[in-house]
Amino acid sequence: MRKFLLTVFSICTAGMAFGQSKLDLQSQLELYKLRNTAIPTYNSRTRAFERPKSVPENTMAMVEMKDQNDRADLEAQGVKVLRVRGNIAIVVAPIKDIERISALKCVRRMELPRRVYQKMDVVRKEIGVDKIHQGVDLPQAYTGKGVVTGIVDGGIDPNHINFLKPDGSTRFGYISKITASQSNKDGYQFDNYYPRAVLDTLTNRDNAYAIEDFTTDSYTTFHGTHTTGIMAGGYKGNITYAKTNDNDKSYKVTGPNPFYGCATESELVASCGDLRDQYIAFGVDDVVQYAQLSGKKPKPCVINLSLGSNIGVHDSTSVMNRFLAEEGKHAIICVAAGNEANMGIALKKDFAAAGETVKTFLTPMQPDSLSSGGKTYYNLRNGQIAAYSNDSTAFDLQIVVTNTKRGNKAAVRIPLQNNTKGQPITYASGGDYSMSGAVINQTFAKAFDGYVTAASMIDPETGRYYAMAQIMTSDNQKDNKDGNYKLALEIKSKKPGQRVEVYSDAQFIYFDSNKQEGFVSGTRNGSISDMACAANIVTVGSYNVRNHWSSLDGFVYGYNKRGDEDDFPEGEASRFSSFGTLADGRNLPHVCAPGASIISSVNTYAVENPDLGYSDMALQGKLEKGGKKYYWHQSLGTSMATPVVAGAIALWLEANPSLTVKDVVRIIQQTARKDNFVTNTGDPVQWGAGKFDAYAGLKQVLKEKETNGINGVRYAESQEVPVITMTGERSFSAFLAGAKQLNLRAYSLSGQLVHSLSAQGDELNVNASSWNKGVYLIQVNGGKAQRIVIY
């Protein structure tokens, strides 16, 4: 996941109607930003803070309708409906009418865009893809033929030689590009790209262009070209690349490209541009529609999302996550777990009594100075935090300015002691941060330049009370140059047994005790991306396969200095790989795959951008052919691990196009390798089922297909633990390999039996729509109970 500065959310209360419960707090913060031109926001394309010239007329949004037939009602109210999946619509709506639209009877919930962040030679051998390509002990070789491999990402160079057929024609069937646009009345620009041969046949060519003429959507990142190359890069011709014999000096060789990907002959589809969740949803639907409609019959499809955001309730209930779950019925969607486990960005507290308090410091991830857009920030704290109660019970939340020299005594308290129903409470330093409705506090200004705003409400979907805070502070260099004033978070419980979960967006803030008495640090468990918590997806973590690499400048580089402790020991889970135990009882990710570090193709236009300063030191391979230069580069992250799994799943889909996401997850879990690293190092939750094994998984796919196992008999000889899978917010399935009958009992947390069901066979699908909301313990055939949450 690439790190970018978060947009500075401004606070403008004029004209706002608070308490619109169908708009979540994050959407309300986004609405403030869209309506305010006074405070600059960070533009990741220009890498500078810029002031909007005007308030946009429209914005994209996601609407969860009460009924699938409510589309006409939305359109009658001036809403432009772009796509619908299930009862969720992607729409364009006037910014001035957002509150009115969200209050319509046909609307259950409405969410505005949130920003998300970008989260092979050794790899193919490690997971068995080389054996699959060679057809070792298989009926044939598999390369992804007939399968659509889709990706939604930024920094895509579709004409990289890694994505061309041997005859030089493109492997891409379609590309969409979606970018924010002030000049477009809808607030975004949507462009379509087709192979030239297809484009020439189109009668309507509005905003349609040739893929062969596409350069890139971004000149500042290589991310999408890298992930696509891992998933499906297919160039096997000669390149110049670096090798080493002593892990000290490197030398150049010319030979067959060792850095191609997994699904080398699959059909490629991409959506690129600005990284906002609704643009991503639109892009996912583009890929699904292409797979369903571009051939005589629907094509099997896998989609890679090396993207995410840590802000959210971390379950399957957000509108975005429900949309992904709907799309997951038509394609296998793989989502990166996130790269935030190396810092405590989650905080979970079970309170034993009312009035109990937990305190932590909001600690800058990048201490000292940071220059951006011609301005320097000191100990920058910029981003969002969100705190969730386990039910409707409120809690007291305060953002506190503390004074280290006075024993961390509170200098300023920004209180959020009651449900504000979405109305923000804002403290600011004044000057550049003079905002309508804000409290200009002199002590706050003495400590920081910037602002803090917080609001709270009850989530109408889950019934949980939650609060959010938006923060941007830079240490005042006149009165706080030594950093004695710090920012802290305090939460006080309202009843015994209350549980509160707090998440940072992981961009510039984490939770730390600073080794101060009475303060606690955050936890790594909970660092999982919110988007990775959707139902009907595959969530992927990372483990290490390489911690050094040969570069074209003649040297070998790595993440560890000589004599230092090994930060990325080969075989272990990557320390950054995010994970979490969710409120509904699930542990994520499902599995880990090689993610540190991976060499793959990169965006030529980013490498040749002089502002980025690429040199042979940063490159592991290159080729000049036909007047264009192509490059290969190493990178690491769950962003790299996820397309490893997505590309391998494409090989499985070639073998059996009828695989569902449920089949895929089950086979992944059954065939994952549990070596000594998995069993003896790291956190068990972080590992998921273990190390992804593409080869063993494909053999299982073929075995089940041969005996009608997919969607029929389940093979899980070694699996004795029942698998409980949430299939919706109010439905789940239970599977126990080899069972002839299932007896399922659901208990309350107090141990009272509340539901009892039975069925013949090894699988039971449960419709819990009539159950009361809450946490249940599910016991299958007298075994160990597992926890689920019914919303």
Predicted regions and their residues:
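N-terminal domain-start motif of subtilase-like serine proteases
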Residues: Q28-V55, Q118-G168, R205-F222, S371-S372, ...
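Short acidic, glycine-rich surface-loop motifs adjacent to enzyme active sites
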Residues: S266, V288-D315, A336, A488-K495, ...
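Subtilisin-like serine protease catalytic core
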Residues: V136-Y279, P298, G328-H330, G344-I345, ...
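Active-site core segment of subtilase-fold serine proteases
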Residues: I156-G229, G237-S250, G261, N408-I509, ...
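C-terminal tail/sorting-segment detector
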Residues: K773-Y791
